């Protein structure tokens, strides 16, 4: 143990220049409350949609202005960096911030005169930041400590997506970039078509995985040890209390913010592995996932409000590695912008495809066999990109089935 400490202490001096900027990820959930304050002070209801304006407008512009950060912590300092408590505390503090955003917004809707348009704008704004509660849960849920894992469940309950805890860790990380993964999108598949199989597919896979785990322990899937039911119960209690306190408007407000929160995860899943495919080996199994099976983004500003989620390639290579330690690698497939801009592009399928499809084909070296392609778009792509895949349509058929 002493020798291990000597190794850590001898690591070269490293200064994380973004150390205190990560506070932006913790403060981001406060944005709807800032919008409420501005709307109240100015009388301009447009501020209820502040998060929409910042997320889909300001952040893509800031990403374009400030560009990318390719700096990595030296590998030898990563163990020491992982142990620095400050970074973990920021994720803990983010959990009550999400609850504050939900409760304050619900209180305002339930007690103040607002038009339905204003209520809708605030619900969508809250949906964006609470969709990113999934990102907070993602960071905490990959940790081994019981406290962290419970914090993940608690924050996932805010947006009613408790099954993410099981689905992402045990399902997506196992099946990513294969046809078995409902959370991997296919080239040519619009985000709207993707959502129809991704949202129910994620729940079905998560429930099946948890049922198998409990069965091996001789327990019913309806046991309180079910890690999907635990956050679901918190959600039901939380929403029931908000309904009792703030009235029937919650019957509209809460489902809208929840649905748009789910849409944020769908958007992330859609862009993170679009078209990418792990190849089958001779034994019929898929190759081990590698960093190049995820789309990466080093855009500075959006990474600072997302706990480095956009360094997704290293995350899949090292799932338990904390956000401050995630690295970039040369030659990784890269998104043209950060997640906010990519989410916006994804909602306009023609725009997204015009930018991303050539990138996917380039990633595959021009071989369409190495790409997950939506079955309805295969002939279109064969005509558009041609190349060596024309005689091997069986691979793409399997991909899209």
UniProtKB/Swiss-Prot annotation:
Cofactor comment: Binds 2 Fe(3+) ions per subunit.
Bilayer topology annotation: Multi-pass membrane protein
Compartments, record wording: Cell inner membrane
Binding site for Fe cation 2: 173, 312, 315-316
Effect on the protein upon substituting residue 168 to A: Loss of activity
GO CC annotation terms, alphabetical: plasma membrane
Residue spans crossing the bilayer: 21-39, 42-62, 89-111, 114-134, 229-249, 251-270
Pathway(s) annotated for this protein in UniProt: Hydrocarbon metabolism; alkane degradation
CDD domains tied to this protein: Alkane-hydroxylase
Cytoplasmic side: 1-20, 63-88, 135-228, 271-401
Catalytic activity: octane + 2 reduced [rubredoxin] + O2 + 2 H(+) = 2 oxidized [rubredoxin] + octan-1-ol + H2O
Leader sequence residues: none
Keyword Translocase carried by entry: no
Enzyme Commission number(s) from the entry: 1.14.15.3
Keyword vocabulary terms for this entry: Cell inner membrane, Cell membrane, Iron, Membrane, Metal-binding, Monooxygenase, Oxidoreductase, Plasmid, Transmembrane, Transmembrane helix
One protein family per Pfam: FA_desaturase
Swiss-Prot/TrEMBL GO biological process terms: alkane catabolic process; lipid metabolic process
Induction: Induced by AlkS and n-alkanes.
Function: Catalyzes the hydroxylation of n-alkanes and fatty acids in the presence of a NADH-rubredoxin reductase and rubredoxin.
Family to which this protein belongs: Belongs to the fatty acid desaturase type 1 family. AlkB subfamily.
Protein name, per record: Alkane 1-monooxygenase
Organism: Ectopseudomonas oleovorans
Lineage: Bacteria, Pseudomonadati, Pseudomonadota, Gammaproteobacteria, Pseudomonadales
Gene: alkB
């Amino acid at each position: 143990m002493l020798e291990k400490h000597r190794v850590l202490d001898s690591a070269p001096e490293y200064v994380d220049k973004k150390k205190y900027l990560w506070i932006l990820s913790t403060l981001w959930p406060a944005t709807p409350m800032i919008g409420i304050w501005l709307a109240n002070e100015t009388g301009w209801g447009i501020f209820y949609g502040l998060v929409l304006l910042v997320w889909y407008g300001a952040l893509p512009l800031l990403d374009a202005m400030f560009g990318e950060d390719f700096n990595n912590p030296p590998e030898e300092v990563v163990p020491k960096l992982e142990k620095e408590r400050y970074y973990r505390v920021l994720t803990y503090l983010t959990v009550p911030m999400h609850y504050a955003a939900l409760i304050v917004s619900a209180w305002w809707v339930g007690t103040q005169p607002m038009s339905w348009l204003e209520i809708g704008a605030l619900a969508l704004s809250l949906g964006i930041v609470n969709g990113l509660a999934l990102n907070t849960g993602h960071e905490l849920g990959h940790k081994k400590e019981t406290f962290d894992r419970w914090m993940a469940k608690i924050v996932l309950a805010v947006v009613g997506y408790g099954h993410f805890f099981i689905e992402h860790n045990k399902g997506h990380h196992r099946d990513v970039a294969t046809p078995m993964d409902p959370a991997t999108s296919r080239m040519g598949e619009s985000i709207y078509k993707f959502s129809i199989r991704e949202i129910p597919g994620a729940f079905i896979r998560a429930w099946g995985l948890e049922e198998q785990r409990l069965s091996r322990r001789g327990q019913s899937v309806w046991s309180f040890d079910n890690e999907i039911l635990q956050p679901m119960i918190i959600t039901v209690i939380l929403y029931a209390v908000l309904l009792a306190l703030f009235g029937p408007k919650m019957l509209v407000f809460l489902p809208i913010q929840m649905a748009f929160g789910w849409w944020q995860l769908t958007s992330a899943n859609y862009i993170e592995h679009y078209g990418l495919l792990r190849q089958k080996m001779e034994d019929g199994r898929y190759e081990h996932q590698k960093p190049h099976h995820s789309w990466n983004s080093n855009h500075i500003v959006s990474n600072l409000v997302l706990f480095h989620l956009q360094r997704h390639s290293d995350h899949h290579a090292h799932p338990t590695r904390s956000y401050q330690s995630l690295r970039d690698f040369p030659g990784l497939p890269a998104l043209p912008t950060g997640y906010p801009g990519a989410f916006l592009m994804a909602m306009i399928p023609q725009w997204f495809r015009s930018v991303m499809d050539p990138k996917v084909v380039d990633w595959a070296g021009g071989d369409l066999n190495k790409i997950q392609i939506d079955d309805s778009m295969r002939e279109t792509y064969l005509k558009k990109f041609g190349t060596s895949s024309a005689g091997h349509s069986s691979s793409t058929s399997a991909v899209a089935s």
